[in-house]
Amino acid sequence: MRSNVNRTRRRVARRVDPEKAGSMLLRIERTIRSIPRGKVSTYGGVARAAGYPGAARQVAKVLRRSFGLPWQRVLGAGGAIKLQGDSAIEQRLRLEAEGVRFRGRKVDMKAHEWQPRRAKRK
């Protein structure tokens, strides 16, 4: 019986145009910077707002590699803090300092979810 793991490892990585990848990361970074104080978004929400639905992992990558971003405003699905340990505590404290309310362990998304403006089409 063959293992699915071997098939997965043998997949050829998609070739990504470095210029397009850089543009994508910059758009994601700009989107994160545009989340106002007191509002939050999910990894998937940021990806959609940046024009890359399904690129939630790329949002996490940008947050890990960029400095000066309001990282605390990006949460897991449903408003859950996905960080562990002291980082999770720091994220919650930063959000509470911005006036974000929690319901148990999750942010009250009805009150605090950021709704980006949609660009008008011509």
PLM segments and residue spans:
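Nucleic acid-binding interface residues in structured DNA/RNA-binding domains
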Residues: 2-122
